[in-house]
Amino acid sequence: MKKLLALILVFSISSMPFSSAASIKGSQGQVLSVSKTTVKNGSVVTVNGNFFDETVGIYLAFCVIPAKGKAPTPCGGGVNKAGMGEASYWISSNPPPYAVGLTDEYLPGGRFKHSVKISRFIGKVDCRKVSCAITVRADHLRSTDRTHDLFIPVTISK
């Protein structure tokens, strides 16, 4: 009986999805980290940023991983120019006049911390069938600048 219980315990632990935190360092020393990389649909993950250039506004979102050299799109929540919701964020310490109050300012040292909701579908795209990630990219004021792009792939479990 003990062997059977031990076998059941080993099997149940081995079948549990592994969900570790992950981080990535960008070319300019910025660090992006996420609390979990394997989640269930509708889960919320914590995303931290450190050492980001406070003169460059960024978007933080859950997006389809793009082809090399392209901006991440589509993204859950779209490009958040309304400053509302938990699917995407516009982070900028020096937003244009029309965006004052819509952006979240960097904390000292180019830091930020946000909760991002993960959805299986981004529009009609199924993130169980294509690769999706927590992403950071330069905001629309530098829309062609790919030097700030960072991606941490996220798996949506069944």
List the predicted regions and their residue ranges.
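C-terminal segment of classical bacterial N-terminal signal peptides
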Residues: 13-20
